[in-house]
Amino acid sequence: IFVIFAYTECYFMRAEKEIETLTIEEIRDRLSKTVNEQELPILVEGFTVLAKSRNLFDIAMNAQTPYRLPGIRIGLLTGGAVNVTVNLINHDVKAPTLAFFSSGSILQLNKVTAEGEVQGMMIEPNYFAELFPHNVPPMFNGQLKDAFIPVDNRDKEKVEHLFQALTLTMKEPAYNRQAAQAIITALCYIYNQ
């Protein structure tokens, strides 16, 4: 793991690109200047949700700039296509596709189609440990660094509905932590399948 990390650092340094850390707070700050409140990521202690929204990649990230992503991130590309480099590997991704990035992954956005649409979430590692104190789903045990999984429309709709349920739960006047945890757990098991 150390060798891969060192090689990653050297690769991006050779390309004369400084790796920025892109936190959810930074994404929210960048988006808040141009998008309405409904499209901003919802922050709650331990995790953050980005509801289904139009192409926000070009607002949140600068193309051809590598970003280190803190936190475990799962997402769904619901429309369009993207070309990204994740942990030194280039990917052409078309919707509908599930995406997973482990904490510390390095992502560089290369190209996004105009109809690109995404929804997803970031889970802090300590919150993830709270969700799964004994049996972490294998996909999230730390050995897998990133994954793109094409899905059919049925699986896409399942994930979309769970993200929608989580978003609605978080917008309730009285936030229900147990309900949110149950939905996040269900999402993680779907990604693990």
Placement of each model-derived feature along the sequence:
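An amphipathic alpha-helical interaction segment
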Residues: 157-193
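A short, compositionally biased micro-patch
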Residues: 77-79, 94, 102, 112
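Short acidic-glycine-tyrosine-enriched beta hairpin
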Residues: 88-100
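A hydrophobic/aromatic-rich effector-binding and dimerization subdomain
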Residues: 7, 14-19, 34-37, 109-171
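Conserved hydrophobic/aromatic beta-strand scaffold that supports enzyme active sites
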Residues: 74, 98-100, 120-122
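Generic protein-terminus/edge-of-domain signal
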Residues: 1-82, 91
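Short beta-strand His + acidic residue motifs that chelate non-heme Fe in jelly-roll/DSBH
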Residues: 83-85, 101, 107-112
